[in-house]
């Protein structure tokens, strides 16, 4: 007898799972630029939008960022904000697309998950 052992080889579908280290998490502190505006979209969804003024570190000037409150809790809080009020917003950055008269349009917006007065 030879020392060989007969074995059946099973073909196994091995799909490599690649790790995804993505993170879309922002925390911003700044002043509310003006009163928030509630909009109803063609889909029926509601969003409350406002802008946050953030002073640049070590540079002159400010950045004004668009904030969107989509959840009912965030919308309620956003509608009570007053101009120049200091707040903290936590959430994530999203790019919104819509059809405009000139074609497809888009803009970046911070989707507020939590809004806190400071």
Which residues does each PLM region occupy?
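Single-stranded nucleic acid-binding surfaces, predominantly the OB-fold ssDNA-binding core
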Residues: 2-118
């Amino acid at each position: 007898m030879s020392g060989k052992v007969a074995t059946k080889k099973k073909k196994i579908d091995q799909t490599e799972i690649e790790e995804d280290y993505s993170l879309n998490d922002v925390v911003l502190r700044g002043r509310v630029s003006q009163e928030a505006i509630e909009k109803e979209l063609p889909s029926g969804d509601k969003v409350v939008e406002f802008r946050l003024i953030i002073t640049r570190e070590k540079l002159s000037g400010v950045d004004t960022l668009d904030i969107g409150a989509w959840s009912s809790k965030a919308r309620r809080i956003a509608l009570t904000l007053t101009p120049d009020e200091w707040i903290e917003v936590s959430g994530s950055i999203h790019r919104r697309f819509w059809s405009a008269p000139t074609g497809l349009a888009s803009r970046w917006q911070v989707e507020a998950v939590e809004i806190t007065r400071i």
